Amino acid sequence: MSSHLEFKSWVGFPIEKVFLFFADPANLPRLMPPITDTRIDTVRLVPPPVTSIQLTSEQQRSLAGIGSEIVTSFRVLPPLPLRGRWVAKITAFRWNEFFEDVQLQGPFKSWHHRHELVSEVREDKQGTLVIDKVAYAFGLGPLDPLIEALVSKRIEGIFTHRQRILPDLLLG
């Protein structure tokens, strides 16, 4: 059985800036709640498709296109020191619209995360609607509903944290 969650937030920044931020794996630990102590262990980047967007040489070297793999570690049950490993792969990428990642190895039987961005005006200000769509499964049979009740709250907490700190991170 697969579970689905969707999170939306709006930030008062242009879509190009927001997309570049999310497409750089180095920003992932900054988006996570500090208690998770998320770290990037290794990254194998595949450059995104060529675009007419002007990128600095640093941006060209740091963005994750299709085929990129990011290995992270995190505290499984904060504040306990036990660390888990997560291997993610970028499977889809369209400039300033979306990218998708799947879990190759980690705590779930399956995990699919689509990061969508939509240019949107609110109160006469141009900004970006950030939409995160997550589908995941545990594969634990009869234990799935119990685990789902616990884990969905934790996932919601992570995305609430991301939504709260994203504007400040984009300022920096």
Residue ranges and their predicted role:
Residues E100-G157:
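Beta-strand/loop substructures that line and gate deep hydrophobic ligand-binding cavities in soluble
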Residues H112, T160-H161, I165:
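K/E-rich alpha-helical interaction surfaces of small helical-bundle regulatory domains
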Residues I40-L104:
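Glycine-rich portal/gate segments that line the openings of hydrophobic small-molecule binding cavities
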Residues R164-G172:
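Charged phosphate-binding loop/patch that engages nucleotide di/tri-phosphates or the phosphate backbone
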